Curated annotation (Swiss-Prot):
The chain crosses the membrane at residues 33-53, 54-74, 790-812, 819-836, 852-872, 880-900, 903-923, 946-968, 980-1000, 1053-1073, 1078-1098, 1244-1264, 1280-1300. It is a multi-pass membrane protein. The modification Phosphothreonine is found at T129, T370. Residues 444-460, 1925-1939, 1969-1978 have a biased composition (Low complexity). Residues 305-319 have a biased composition (Basic and acidic residues). This is Pecanex-like protein 3. The lineage of its organism: Eukaryota, Metazoa, Chordata, Craniata, Vertebrata. The modification Phosphoserine is found at S127, S392, S431, S505, S1025, S1697, S1909, S1955. Keywords: Glycoprotein, Membrane, Phosphoprotein, Transmembrane, Transmembrane helix. Its main location: membrane. Residues 1890-1910 have a biased composition (Pro residues). It is found in: Membrane.
Length: 2034
């Protein structure tokens, strides 16, 4: 805690005061000195200039010029250095100790340099926060500081398990590279060979491993060579990968210890050259004869490379970094890089030894050469988790070879072989600064036992079992002089993040080498040790390495503490470790960005001892030891630390607080610490020192880790030993607090590193002239912020110069004296310094990590304030305006300007404290806020959703005001005749009302409008975008939005003209002048009365608790008493009244009030021309009229109070202050909005800190509560200021102390974050098959919130207009709560007939705190009978005293308890219980077989399959008598047709069971087919059924009695993972439709039929019933895997029923569930939350997590507080501040899409609708006259044909049999006979369009007698009572149809009537003017009602239906379900979704 406070003080508080400068002990001396000197110069230089030189503009110019030169120089050098790193041209310099021979250029190297590949795994993007704005991936040198490349994984509430993190693979934020090893130099080879133990006399020597690439033979390969190893530079796999392996998988690999074979790896390109025989282990005798290999032995751990590396800046993709060679090197032939970047690889100093290349993708590790007793080849089993290593494309690499003509410095071993680990495959890229060493070994790291090999195995196992170096003299036959193996090696790393799994990790070479076991696991290890030793007899080694104390340990610990426990980077001065010819020096990030941990000391590498004697001398010297670690994602185990001693009681559980219990943890700086509990609960905390363990075989007990860390020299006093400490990586997502860490006690032997190459980059000074620069990118990023482009650099230099000029200008003006001059210079310095090194994170930054926008905030604000000060001073001196008195205040006087100037001056001086408190937002937020406030309060605009929309909205308002201003000015400048209104003023009034109406109906977001314009003006662009969009599943939302906006524009075209004409007529009359003394008060009283009744009385009577006194609403909806809602909400009379009164209020009363005020004010101005300024008055009248009218149209609930206060204040209280009613009303509207904000803030504060209900979330809350009392006065002042500036008041760390935050717009979150669903459309195939991405409940459940968003988009605006959510306004927040759905809905933009909102869905099963708050908002308080301390009860339907008091002290209230919304009911059944016994599995298999037969018979390709030669030939043996498929997966217990006699599946046994079903299915085909038992059809069915069952058995791994494998296989087949492994089944590949269209849907349908079996076991015994059931399910039910994009499309298209098999992988459960969804109407509780509560809590979370860096997942600010819903609100923040499972994009709902509201007012009015209505009226009159003349004629023949006209709005397909609706429209045709055909109720009265109960799941049995009664259609009956079986045509539109009229009654001239042959009725285009949609038609459900036998013959949907002019609401509700999924017409149906 203390260190975190110090870090916040240093990096947060002090840096905010200085503009970004602070002393960072973790950075280098040069970095800190540079920062300090730059900051001092920026501070002192202007101060000295002002104090020493006389004030003049020349001095200011010199000052600006100096600043510009300095900034230009710094930024140019910074930019050029980054460009230098991007190009990556390296100058290789040899150490002076190396021989001249090494300096000679390589000759004859025919292989050009190749770029070593980097294999990466890209994991899930944790959040959309951009990564740190650096580009460390360009650095050739940066490999260990992986955390700088990774994004800051922000704390997302509860810590996420690392398994979950790995499982949820996403975009490209986290990159873990698993390749990139160093090459060996010759000296290293010698040392390595020298260290190799000689083969014991009894052992047969194995040959060396020659190069396996036949095209590139190794010159050193030969028989009898002991071995020459590959690379020693392998880093263990990232613990992120290791943590993903389960404990069981880890333990399963313990058995793979026996093989001790050297490994030969072949690359992918060699394998292609060699063909199939390429992957062959070499014979032990070196003969080259291939050794047989078992299946699976060539599995590679790493499957591919991502050739693109992540940049920290905007994730750009960069090319590889290229290396340069010394002069005289070979020419880079064949380089695939850009010519300027082409470089040569320096030649290896060792002749003839090809160097080791990087680990490639598709590299196969093959065992070659086992120890004498173990001859079996190695079997590699890859766990499923390793599928996260995904293959991808690559770039061609740089080839590199050592020149063959070079001579070694020392003679090699005679006949010495060489194992070449060379990859020549095309397509590799060196990813600088981002490569983790691959782990090619069985990991020694705890809990990371993957099947990945290490080249150590080949290094140590060639020619025989690899032996460790025993103590001196222990080895036999040391004939070779000892050589030192080159390269520092690594020790096993500590436990990875999942430290639960205690597993024994083993050496990849076999069991002869034992790694030191984990502490606490010795019992498990010893048992394994015996096994390992038995498997490796030739090696006699101790089972566990001995421990040796490190004598110099205190010095190491002291150095750690001196470095602040996390060291800085040592300077790279002196010798470097020479590891290979490809130098990848580690660049240490010397600065840690916002929210990250500080950088530890550089890892300083050395080489191990060259001999055993040296090793012993090294131990005797007691040099400091350190541990090497992989620089991977391991937060929990980033340091190898010891346990403090043998007698320490280490806590095994998190809650062990007994005396002496030691807990290990990592502080915020990544330092591992221990906390020991003492007496009485006390304790003490210590940093854990570095202790290690020396092993007897230290030379071999290290991992290769040569280039994973930065190397730097150490003083000679340390004996040349180098120290290692990796950088800890911030990864809050791991559960590191809950598990005790397993820390092995190990020590690495270090020896003095040999001389190594020194690296420099080419820095081009001039074209052709360059100099060498030794620097690193990460050090540069720690020194200066990176600016990307040239323009950005120019802008930064210009801005710094402007700051200097304006600041010095104010100094010259003499605004500052004494100490304030120095303070002002401090402000100047902070603004300029932030352009070089900004504060990260800033107090106003909305995001973790580096926020580049915030760097420009200070200088921009400074320039604005300086210009404002200068301008105000100039205005005060010049006084260009005459003083104006307004409401008693004198404006534009000299004192006014000077006062404003002084305020701005003081504010500028307070800049350091302003930015420390975060009172100013970042620049783009401030711009959006200012524009939105001006537009809303000045012009009556709606809220903005982005800076672009704010600019567009304000520009639109200014354009309208400019247009109106001319008319107004012209009207009032001319004299008015007595008692007359000029025509120009009437024109102004008409235009004002019409434009206000139009602007109120338009959204501030111009995206949809621009899309419409583009489609008209640039149709080719639209077509191009449509073609791009067709690649993905179609989303109907954009088309619906365009259609809705088009309707609004068409309607406004008519309505604006009508409104303008009517307003002109009313204004031109003298009514406002003649009645001005009386009319005004009449209008005010009428507006007040209507407003009070509409917006206060009605909402209170409809609330759940009216006035918090009554326990039930007075006006209840029809659904209030229903336990379960059965249909759409009925429109009640009070809802109609509410909507009607609102229309009267909006369109009659308030326009009349404004017109009256305008006319009276204009008349007054004209009457007193000397008193008023015409120009100002015209401007005020225009702006005020526009604002008031738009506000009245958009948000009428707030207008009546504003009007009442205006009348009371200026007519009765202060009439002398009145400036005319129009201006009074305008001012009061502005004042009232601020007063409402203040009222909401005070309510929130008082509710939150009320002592009787305070909920302390932490000890700090209890501590801060008393201190909030004296804070109250300041709190009230803050509340006033926050109300004035619309800033949130946020509780500090969730406590009772409130502070003001920075100003925010109504859309108060600044990041445009919304959820991206993970499914099969955005994940790779291999991850889908192996890891099932997105299988967590949150990702799968997010689709229901997405569907809820679409439902709200359809109905929200209409429901608000009907008053179902109570009163509302822009910025309001609501919570929708149901059984499992809990969502926060935020209304952003509220217009006239439109609402823009965002929905944030919370977890279904949230945290404990969330559950408590959900209970609070869902439980009723009616039963409370308490009154203080007693319980006297309460009156009927009245709340008790306690309940009434408690409800008043809440920040939320229930506005509706039964809000009905369409959604999905979710039922899940445990699949295990349904398949537990064999009988149930047999039923499933039987249905599986029958479903396959069904789909075979239904397939249109059946004839093709039966005639296919390949299929026929493959199935011919099946008909041979006695044939049986005896696969072991078939069993009598699960296969009904199992032939016990033949022990398998035979054709006769198959026919005995299924022939009847096959024949029935064939009989239902339209084309006859042979159905005999030996016919091709039966044979094909048999083959497919056998194949399907074998696929299930293969996926299940067996058909054993165990249920888990069976469910696993069933789920694999359900999601489409078919593994055809048997050669007998390969015939299916003749046509993949056999799998896609037969087997795959068969297994899914079988699951549905199996579900139905439980409800009615005997239902499907008859073939007809089964066939019809499958057909019905196929038609009405979507059965799909939840990861399939079709699942999402089906839900969003409102499919009635869906079924899926879900595999739930939680932390504690692994189960399979059958998910069934049924579309129905759900009941929600609508809770209105105080919007200031939401704004304040969100602002508090942002400040706490981002600026104060609180990473505690159980922090007090997210504990439950029922009075404020603290947990639910904070959980709904954007990730990573909160953890919603779904965040919708901003969605606009239009009133026209609400079917019930549309039925009330008849739909939109347009020119087409008017013309249509006129023509239909004429036709009706014409038919009426014709009927009168022709007696006996059928009057209704024409207008009843299919409903005609508007009643034919069905988008259903034509049916084979005429429906009752069809027959009703086609004369008197009788109903066709058939089952299930009872009379049907009329559809015209249905307002919701619910499908009939026939669509419910499970469906009723289809065959059988018809229903006894008509199927009721629920919904409001807005027209006439339904008639049985006849579509009544007596509604307002019924007899106006023009059936059959070309171009009118039908679309495109086709008849509108539905013909008896099943023609699809066409939708009508224009609508009736008055009540064209009063019928509120639902979709025609004739398809659902058709006979089941005909269901399979139903054709597709008519594709022309979407093109019809049907309005959205005309469809009643969402469309009918998707038809057969193969139908191409299923997708156009989605366009009718809304």
């Amino acid at each position: 805690m203390g260190s975190q406070v110090l870090q916040i003080l240093r990096q947060g508080v002090w840096a905010s005061l200085t503009g970004g400068w602070f002393f960072d002990p973790h950075q280098s001396t040069f970095s800190n000195c540079f920062h300090l000197y730059v900051w001092i110069f920026l501070l002192i230089f202007p101060f000295l200039l002002y104090m020493v030189l006389p004030p003049s503009l020349m001095v200011a110019g010199v000052y600006c010029l100096v600043v510009a030169v300095i900034f230009a120089t710094i930024k140019t050098v910074n930019y050029r250095l980054h460009a230098m790193f991007d190009q990556g041209e390296i100058v290789e310099k040899r150490s002076s100790t190396m021989g001249e021979l090494e300096e000679e250029p390589a000759q004859g190297d025919s292989n050009p340099p190749r770029d070593p590949g980097v294999e990466m795994t890209v994991f899930r993007k944790v959040s959309s926060t951009p990564p740190v704005r650096c580009s460390s991936q360009h650095s050739v040198f940066g490999f260990n500081q992986v955390s700088e490349l990774l994004p800051r994984m922000e704390d997302s509430g509860p810590l996420r398990d690392i398994k979950e993190l790995v499982r949820e693979q996403g975009s490209n934020n986290v990159i873990v590279t698993s390749a990139d090893r160093e090459m060996l130099k010759l000296s290293s080879q010698e040392k390595l060979i020298g260290d190799l133990p000689q083969t014991p006399p009894g052992a047969v020597p194995d040959p060396s491993l020659a190069s396996t690439d036949s095209s590139e033979p190794s010159p050193l390969a030969g028989d009898g060579a002991p071995w020459s190893g590959s690379s020693m530079a392998d880093t263990p796999m990232s613990p992120l990968l290791k943590g993903s392996l389960s404990q069981e998988l880890s333990k399963s690999f313990l058995t793979l210890t026996q093989p001790d074979r050297a490994l030969v790896r072949t690359s992918s390109r060699r394998e292609q050259r060699r063909g199939a025989g390429g992957y062959q282990p070499l014979d032990r005798r070196g003969s080259g004869e291939p050794t047989p290999q078992k299946a699976g032995s060539s599995d590679s751990c790493f499957s591919g490379t991502d050739r693109e590396t992540l940049s920290s800046f905007k994730s750009e993709k960069t090319n590889s970094t290229h290396l340069d060679s010394p002069p005289g090197g070979p020419a880079p032939e064949g380089s695939d890089t850009d010519p300027p970047s082409e470089a040569e690889l320096p030649a290896s100093p060792d002749a003839g030894v090809p160097s080791d290349d990087t680990l490639r993708s598709f590299d196969t590790v093959i065992g070659a050469g086992t120890p004498p007793g173990l001859a079996e080849p190695l079997l590699v089993v890859r766990p499923k988790d390793l599928a996260l290593l995904r293959p991808s494309k690559r770039q061609p690499p740089l080839r590199r070879h050592s020149p063959p003509g070079r001579a070694p410095r020392r003679p090699l071993l005679e006949g010495g072989g060489f194992f070449e680990d060379e990859d020549t495959s095309e397509g590799s890229e060196l990813s600088p600064a981002s490569s983790l060493r691959s782990q090619r070994r069985y990991s020694t790291d705890s809990s990371s036992s993957t099947s990945c090999y290490s080249p150590e195995s080949s290094r140590g196992a060639a020619g025989g079992p690899r032996k460790r170096r025993a103590p001196h003299g222990a080895e036999e036959g040391t004939a070779v002089p000892p050589k030192r193996p080159y390269g520092t090696q690594r020790t096993p790393s500590t436990a990875s993040a999942k430290t639960h799994a205690r597993v024994l990790s083993m050496d990849g070479a076999g069991g002869d080498v034992l790694r030191p076991p984990l502490a606490g696991c010795k019992a498990e290890l010893e048992a394994q040790v015996g096994v390992e030793q038995a498997a490796s007899e030739p090696v006699v080694l101790p089972a566990e390495a001995r421990r040796g104390p490190a004598a110099n340990q205190p010095g190491w610990r002291g150095e750690l503490q001196e470095e602040g426990a996390v060291g800085g980077a040592a300077e790279e001065t002196g010798r470097r470790d020479r590891s290979s010819s490809v130098r990848r020096t580690q660049a240490i990030r010397r600065r840690h960005n916002a929210g990250s941990n500080p950088t530890p000391p550089a890892s300083v590498m050395g080489s191990p001892p060259s001999s055993l004697q040296e090793a012993q001398r090294g131990r005797a010297a007691s040099h400091s030891r350190a541990l090497t670690l992989p620089s991977a994602l391991h937060f929990a185990s980033s340091l190898l630390l010891t346990r403090a001693g043998a007698n320490v009681h280490e806590a095994c559980t998190f809650d062990d607080t007994s005396e002496g219990a030691v807990h290990y943890f990592y502080d915020e700086s990544g330092v591992r610490r221990s906390y020991t509990f003492g007496l009485a609960g006390g304790g003490y905390e210590n940093p854990v020192g570095q202790q290690g363990e020396q092993t007897a075989n230290g030379a071999w007990d290290r991992h290769s880790h040569s280039s994973s860390f930065h190397s730097a020299d150490v003083p000679e006093a340390t004996g040349g030993l180098n120290l290692l400490q990796p950088r800890p990586v911030v990864l809050q997502g791991m559960q590191v607090r809950r598990v005790p860490l397993e820390i092995p006690e190990e020590q690495t032997l270090m020896e003095e590193a040999p001389p190594r190459a020194q690296h420099s980059y080419k820095y081009w000074l001039l074209p052709g002239r360059w100099t060498s620069v030794r620097y690193e990118r990460l050090a540069l990023l720690a020194l200066l912020d990176r600016t990307r482009g040239v323009l950005e650099n120019i802008f930064g230099v210009g801005l710094s110069s402007l700051v200097a000029f304006l600041g010095y200008l104010l100094l010259l003006k003499g605004f500052f004296t004494d100490i304030w001059v120095f303070q002002f210079c401090l402000v100047i310095a902070s603004c300029q310094y932030s352009l070089l090194k900004s504060v990260q994170p800033d107090a106003a930054s909305p995001m973790h990590g580096h926020n580049w926008v915030i760097a420009y905030s200070r200088p921009v604000y400074f320039c604005i304030c300086c210009l404002l000060i200068w301008l105000l001073d100039a205005l005060g001196s010049a006084q260009p305006f005459p003083p104006v008195s307004l409401y008693g205040l004198t404006l534009f006087s000299a004192s006014f300007f000077f006062c404003a100037r002084d305020v701005a001056t003081v504010f500028t001086l307070c800049f350091p404290f302003v930015f420390l408190l975060g009172l100013l937002p970042q620049v783009n937020t401030c711009l959006m806020y200012l524009l939105e406030q001006i537009d809303m309060h000045g012009f009556g605009g709606t809220a903005a959703t982005s800076p672009l929309t704010a600019v567009f909205s304000l520009s639109r308002s200014l354009l309208a005001a400019a247009l109106l201003y001319g008319f107004c000015l012209g009207a009032i400048k001319t004299p008015w005749p007595e008692q007359h209104v000029p025509v120009l003023f009437s024109v102004f009034c008409g235009l004002l009302v019409a434009l206000s109406y139009h602007l109120s109906r338009q959204s501030s977001d111009p995206t949809v409008l621009w899309s419409l314009i583009r489609s008209k003006l640039f149709p080719e662009l639209e077509e191009r975008s449509l073609e791009t969009a067709r690649a993905e599943p179609p989303d109907p939302l954009p088309d619906k939005m365009r259609q809705s906006v088009r309707e609004v524009l068409h309607s406004d075209l008519v309505m604006c003209v009508v409104i303008a004409v009517l307003t002109f007529a009313i204004s031109a009359s003298t009514v406002f002048i003649a009645l001005k003394s009386v009319l005004g008060f009449v209008l005010y009283a009428l507006a007040g009365a209507v407003g009070f009744f509409t917006h206060y009385l009605l909402p209170q009577l409809r609330k759940q608790l009216p006035w918090f006194c009554l326990s039930q609403p007075v006006l209840k909806p029809l659904e209030y008493s229903q336990y379960e809602v059965r249909g759409a909400a009925q429109v009640m009379w009070f809802e109609k009244l509410y909507a009607g009164l609102q229309c009267v209020e909006k369109y009659l009363i308030y326009p009349a009030v404004v017109l009256n005020a305008l006319t009276v004010d204009a008349h007054t101005v004209v009457s007193h021309p000397d008193k008023y300024c015409f120009y100002c008055r015209a401007l005020l009248m225009t702006v005020a009229g526009l604002k008031l009218l738009r506000s009245a149209f958009c948000c009428p609930p707030q207008q009546y109070l504003t009007l009442a206060f205006t009348v009371l204040l200026f007519h009765f209280d202060y009439p002398r202050l009145s400036q005319g009613f129009l201006l009074d009303y305008f001012l009061m509207s502005l004042l009232c909005s601020k007063l409402w904000d203040l009222l909401y803030k005070l309510r929130f504060v008082l509710t939150y800190i009320a002592p009787w209900q305070i909920t302390w979330g932490s000890a700090f809350h209890a501590f801060a509560q008393p201190f909030a009392v004296p804070h109250s006065a300041m709190l009230f002042v803050q509340a006033l200021l926050s109300g004035l500036f619309s800033t949130p008041l946020n509780p500090l760390l969730g406590s009772a102390v409130f502070i003001m935050s920075y100003a925010r717009p109504l859309k108060f979150w600044e990041r445009d974050y919304n959820t991206k669903r993970v499914d099969h459309s955005n994940t790779r195939l291999v991850t889908q098959l192996d890891r099932n991405p997105g299988a967590d409940d949150n990702n799968l459940n997010s689709i229901f919130y997405e569907h809820l968003t679409r439902s709200l988009q359809h109905t929200l605006c209409g429901d608000l207009v009907l008053g179902r959510w109570g009163n509302y306004g822009p910025g309001d927040c609501f919570v929708l709560a149901s059984d499992y759905l809990n969502a926060l809905v935020h209304l952003i933009e509220v217009g006239n007939g439109l609402v823009t909102f965002q929905l944030r869905g919370l977890e279904f099963r949230g945290t404990y705190c969330q559950q408590r708050e959900v209970e609070a908002i869902t439980e009723g308080v009616e039963e409370d009978e308490g009154c203080c301390c007693c319980e006297p009860g309460h009156l009927p339907r009245v709340l008790s005293f306690n309940a009434a008091f408690g409800q008043r002290w809440l920040a939320w209230e229930v506005t509706a308890s039964k809000y009905v919304l369409e959604g999905y009911s979710i039922s899940d059944n445990n699949a295990a219980s349904m398949l537990q016994v064999f009988d149930l599995r047999k039923i499933l298999i039987t249905y599986y077989v029958k479903s396959i037969i069904y789909y075979v018979s239904r397939s249109p390709k059946l004839e093709v399959w039966l005639s296919h030669e390949g299929i026929t030939a493959a199935l011919r043996p099946v008909r041979v008598p006695g044939y049986a498929d005896s696969d072991p997966t078939f069993s009598l217990s699960v296969d009904e047709d199992y032939d016990l006699r033949l022990s398998g599946l035979s054709l006769p046994s198959f026919c005995a069971v299924h022939l009847e079903w096959i024949q029935y299915c064939a009989s239902r085909r339209s084309q006859p087919v042979d159905q005999d038992w030996n016919s091709p059809l039966v044979t094909l069915c048999f083959g497919l059924c056998v194949l399907g069952r074998r696929a299930l058995g293969t996926a299940s791994h067996s058909m054993s009695a165990s249920l888990e494998p069976f469910l696993y296989g069933l789920h694999a087949l359900f999601k489409g993972d078919f593994r055809i492994t048997s050669p007998r089944d390969e015939w299916v590949f003749a046509d993949m439709d056999l799998l896609h269209r037969v087997v795959a849907p068969g297994v899914r349908m079988a699951l549905k039929l199996h579900q139905d079996h439980f409800t009615s076991p005997d239902e499907y015994e008859e073939p007809a019933a089964l066939y019809d059931a499958i057909a019905a399910n196929e038609e009405r039910l979507v059965i799909s895997h939840e990861g399939d994009p079709a699942w999402r499309s089906a839900i969003l298209s409102n499919t009635p029923s869906l079924l899926a098999l879900r595999h739930v992988l939680d932390d504690a459960s692994d189960e399979y569930k059958i998910i069934m969804l049924n579309r129905r109407h759900l009941s929600f509780r609508v809770i209105k939350v105080n919007r200031e509560c939401v704004r304040g809590l969100w602002a508090g979370q942002q400040q706490e997590l981002v600026f104060l860096r609180n990473r505690n997942p159980e922090r007090g600010s997210i504990q439950n507080a029922k009075q404020a819903l603290r947990n639910m609100i904070n959980s709904s923040c954007d990730q990573p501040l909160g953890y919603p499972i779904y965040v919708s994009p901003l969605t606009t709902s239009l009133a026209g899409s609400h079917p019930q509201l549309r039925a009330l007012w008849g739909g939109p009015i347009s020119l087409g609708a008017i013309a249509h209505w006129l023509l239909r009226t004429w036709e009706r009159l014409h038919k009426g006259c014709g009927a009168g003349c022709n007696s006996g004629g059928n009057v209704d023949d024409s207008d009843c044909s299919g409903g005609g006209g508007l009643t034919s709005l069905s988008n259903n397909p034509p049916v084979a049999h005429p429906t009752p609706e069809n027959t009703a429209g086609n004369g008197d045709q009788p109903l066709p006979p058939g089952p299930g055909w009872g009379p049907r109720s009329s559809l015209s009265g249905s307002g919701d369009g619910r499908p009939p109960p026939l669509l419910q799941w499970p469906p009723p049995r289809l065959p059988g007698p018809p229903p006894a009664s008509p199927i009721p259609t629920e919904g409001p009956r807005t027209s006439r009572p339904p008639g049985p079986g006849l579509l009544s045509s007596e509604g307002p539109s019924g007899k106006w149809s023009l059936g059959g009229r070309k171009g009118l009654g039908g679309s495109d001239g086709e008849p509108a009537s539905g013909s008896p042959k099943g023609g699809t009725p066409k939708s009508q285009a224009p609508l009736d003017l008055s009540l064209s949609l009063s019928l509120s038609l639902s979709p025609d459900v004739s398809t659902e009602a058709s006979p089941p036998r005909a269901s399979q013959d139903i054709p597709c949907l008519d594709s022309s239906a979407p093109e019809s002019g049907t309005p959205m609401g005309a469809l009643g509700d969402w469309p009918a379900p998707i038809e057969e999924r193969e139908s191409p017409a299923a997708q156009p149906l989605l366009e009718h979704q809304y």
